[in-house]
Amino acid sequence: MNTARSSALSTVASSLLLSRSTRFTSLFISSKRRSSTSWNRKYITSLRNTTQIGGVSVNSPLNVARQGQQVRMASKITDWVKPGDSSGEFKRQVSSFRDWISKEPGAKFPPEKGRYHLYVSYACPWATRTLIVRKLKGLEDFISFSSVHWHMGEKGWCFPTPEDTDAAGENVIPDPVPGHEKYTHIREVYFSVDPNYGGRFTVPVLFDKKTNTIVNNESSEILRMLNHVFDDQLPAEYAKLDFYPEPLKTQIEEAHGWIYDGINNGVYKSGFATTQEAYDRNVTTLFDALDKAEKHLAEMGGPYWFGDQLTEVDIRLFPTLIRFDPVYVQHFKCNLRDIRSGYPLLHKYTRDLYWKHPAFKDTTNFLHIKNHYTRSHTQINPHSITPLGPVPDILPLDEEVNAVKAALTK
């Protein structure tokens, strides 16, 4: 994208951050300039006071009773808010397996080529982080991977069977680890390591094929260990890549803090909320954080979060942004604005990563993404209908939605 076009997009972005002029996703400059944070919160408050569902106010006794009926249901693996939790807040589970692959002498898990396997889901943004860094660092021959089927049922993530024809993608295969031939679900991997495991059966899972145990199931830690742990064995072009550089560590950690809470996890806290108050609070925080991210990109000039250096922040933010318009806008009700028409710089940033870096594009599978959310979360979408749009899932680099085109010509 040329300099003039980038400058024009920055101008549009600056205008958007200063004003959100209507009750719908809006692109353009209003006569009154208000801060985006204030606008988000005032807008949510006004909706809360007026919204009705089927002619019934969301805060009416009838609607409160309906909410009570929902929380009295028995707990299931697909209950994202614990039944009986009156807060309505989604609370993410802390990962249980936290060992590291290490180059230290005598390490329990040394960096041996071919020893480790990565279980992922193309649908899962947390797992996608690990696939991205694996490809960026040229670790394809060092760590094998396989993807589960996109569907999550009562037993959690399932492995595809040879008969499955609805989950196309690289390495979407039955469990390939020796000894796991009869496994049908990722839960069996967890139980093989700890028969008493009582947590969620999440991905990614970094598995040691030599000792038949789980090394780590925390995506941020897997990302960080793969950043350097195999460098001694890699060609120079890959070994030199550092996504957690010393001069930027403090800034990276600061960004991780609010991006994780407000955006990465914010979409889930909005979408899985079971009370209006929890939804209002979290969706407002989400869009405040998106506004902050848009402002940051305007200040830095791109193409990456820290200007011309690709870091962990980009690897962790991208999976959420690429899912935003296809899924989170409609499925998680994150619909104050979308990315492609409401955030010009975040839109450009996401497309730059996708179209210019195979590690980002090749690990994005829109079929798995859209089908998983819309057909697994039956408490949100009971008929499992998958919307056709947006079309396309991601726009080409130099194409804009009509509203942005109009803004660029002003």
Question: Where in the sequence are the language-model features?
Answer:
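C-terminal alpha-helical interaction module
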Residues: 1-410
